[in-house]
Amino acid sequence: MASQEKASMAGHMFDVVVIGGGISGLSAAKLLAEHETNVLVLEARDRVGGRTYTVRNKHVNYVDVGGAYVGPTQNRILRLSKELGLETYKVNVNERLVQYVKGKSYPFRGAFPPVWNPIAYLDYNNLWRTMDNMGKEIPADAPWEAPHAEEWDKMTMKDLIDKICWTKTARQFASLFVNINVTSEPHQVSALWFLWYVKQCGGTTRIFSITNGGQERKFVGGSGQVSERIMELLGDRVKLEHPVTYVDQSGDNIIVETLNHEHFECKYVISAIPPALTAKIHFKPELPSERNQLIQRLPMGAIIKCMMYYKEAFWKKKDYCGSMIIEDEEAPISITLDDSKPDGSLPAIMGFILARKADRLAKLHKEMRKKKICELYAKVLGSQEALQPVHYEEKNWCEEQYSGGCYTAYFPPGIMTQYGRVIRQPVGRIYFAGTETATRWSGYMEGAVEAGERAAREILNALGKVAEKDIWLQEPESKDVPAVEITHSFWERNLPSVGGLLKIIGFSTSITALWIVVYKFKLLTRS
């Protein structure tokens, strides 16, 4: 009662309070405001953007040290950003990419490095085909209802990789594929969850590709502008440095309290923060047991994002685009992309330190990380110019107390089938957004927009402003960034796996042996 009186006396009465000023929370608030709903956003940091963050200084002009990439089929973020007046540009892949493996560099073009060993090729082909086929069985909006959900959720991705792959090279690349896509280790994540994650991003090729894939484009001026421009539209309805510590929905209205003991009264709440961070909030009444158990079981991925700036794009002298896939346990960086500005100015290479490597290298001083990265680039690109950067930026997302890591929360084995179905189920008058609750491109900015707008429409439905059938809306394809259908050749669809080839050889050998025995028997009977 005392909290309610404080909130009312301060005039802090709203229809909806949104917890979290990232893209998901702000896209929810924007939609609510457009429907003449009195909304307030409470953000813990001194900035908006959440896991997107555009740093600006004289050395870089602007740089995305958090989420940055958009591409075809990510139609919601493309629509929203266009509405906000933002433009995209394509990440440079005009020159060749480089694969670094076993101490040697191999230039290539396309989404995946080529495989010349015929046995390894069969293994790689079967890996991608099997993962995509398994994903087709998993409903994007309810992975726990997949026919093999229980079986696959008991397995780690390491278990599945070991089961599918015959060759060491395929197993190692599959492990790297997990590291790159979800910033965690194959032994940490549920096979069901990872297969779902890849499926809802459009499959193995779409999620991993630059051209026609999830990394095709960036925003001119940085992705942080999405949140910043929504904040400009909302004005004083966004409050920074207001970490929420208490949510009381035991009375007629909900009381939300912040760390500085401000109180706000509302009818509904949207939680648009990573699931694990809701453990920082005290709830009255307590969260239901399944929800409480879920938020304790969804760790965040580990990543340090690193941008190395040079006087010139020296890698282009060798017809390299700046994108590298690095398979080396001692290498700090696992994958890179060109991070130069759209006009080619401020040449830079962006690299990810991922999963176990992020944990290991976080212990070093920043200058030592910089040195190790430069030495790696010199080796992979075959140029001493890599040792002479003019500037270095990095962001260790693991040390962010209001993110806990990046890109996204992951599901360890057994959690999806046991608790996953409550991920976006409302708790009383509290609704849940955040990219983790999305059904398309979860983990990306696209998923954040989907989740935020869906949560907003759920509340608009409760307020009688939106029909129930309009809570989940299909998004039209972007006309500016159309998707090209991903197709597979006859051989990619039909080549046997290594195991299948061995069975064919074994069967053929048996038939041949049987034919020889029969032939010799006939010769004997004739004589």
Swiss-Prot record:
Positions where N-acetylmethionine occurs in the chain: 1
Cofactors required: FAD
Chain's role: Catalyzes the oxidative deamination of primary and some secondary amine such as neurotransmitters, with concomitant reduction of oxygen to hydrogen peroxide and has important functions in the metabolism of neuroactive and vasoactive amines in the central nervous system and peripheral tissues. Preferentially oxidizes serotonin. Also catalyzes the oxidative deamination of kynuramine to 3-(2-aminophenyl)-3-oxopropanal that can spontaneously condense to 4-hydroxyquinoline.
Taxonomic lineage from the root: Eukaryota, Metazoa, Chordata, Craniata, Vertebrata
Family: Belongs to the flavin monoamine oxidase family.
Membrane-related topology note: Single-pass type IV membrane protein
Organism: Equus caballus (Horse)
Record has Transmembrane helix as a keyword: yes
Gene transcribed to yield this protein: MAOA
Protein name stated in the entry: Amine oxidase [flavin-containing] A
Residue list for modification S-8alpha-FAD cysteine: 406
Subunit structure: Monomer, homo- or heterodimer (containing two subunits of similar size). Each subunit contains a covalently bound flavin. Enzymatically active as monomer.
Phosphoserine PTM positions: 383
